[in-house]
A protein has these predicted regions:
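Gly/Gly-Pro-rich "capping" loops immediately C-terminal to redox-active cysteine motifs
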Residues: 23, 27-34, 46-87
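Flexible coil segments in periplasmic/lumen-exposed cytochrome c-class electron-transfer proteins
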Residues: 12-30, 38-39, 80-119
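N-terminal signal peptide c-region/cleavage motif recognized by signal peptidases
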Residues: 6-8
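Bacterial N-terminal signal peptides
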Residues: 1-4
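Short cysteine clusters
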Residues: 41-44
Length: 119
């Protein structure tokens, strides 16, 4: 069954992410997943973004704005053990894609943490 779910929309009316069958995603969202993996965010937030030492991003992104997300990733929360990624070129160059991937997980549109490109 093919189901296309562009659920979150940015201000320009361009979908924040596009998901098919719960795990096939557009190229930008795929870049976000690859950035997640490269930055090893799963060490603290868990392989399924459900939290470990760090909080669940599935829950956090339900209430956190994109601006708050960017600030947290860029500056870290050193008092809580969250490192800063502000000097990571890969993370900062792909922050919008990373947000799209994690927001899709939080919204429930992306139903598993490991995604594949839409073909």
């Amino acid at each position: 069954m093919l189901s296309l779910l562009p659920t979150a929309v940015q201000a320009q009316d361009k979908p924040l992410y596009t998901v098919v069958d719960g795990y096939k995603v557009d190229a930008d969202t795929m870049t976000g997943f690859r950035t997640w993996r490269a930055a090893a965010c799963d060490r603290c937030h868990g392989a399924n973004q459900e939290g470990m030492v760090g909080p669940s991003l599935i829950s956090s992104l339900k209430a956190m704005s994109k601006d708050e997300f960017v600030k947290t990733v860029r500056d870290g929360r050193l008092d809580k053990g969250m490192q800063s990624f502000g000097t990571s070129k890969q993370v900062m160059d792909n922050i919008d894609s990373l947000y799209a991937y994690l927001k899709g997980r939080s919204d429930g549109a992306i139903t598993r943490s490991k995604v594949e490109p839409i073909r």
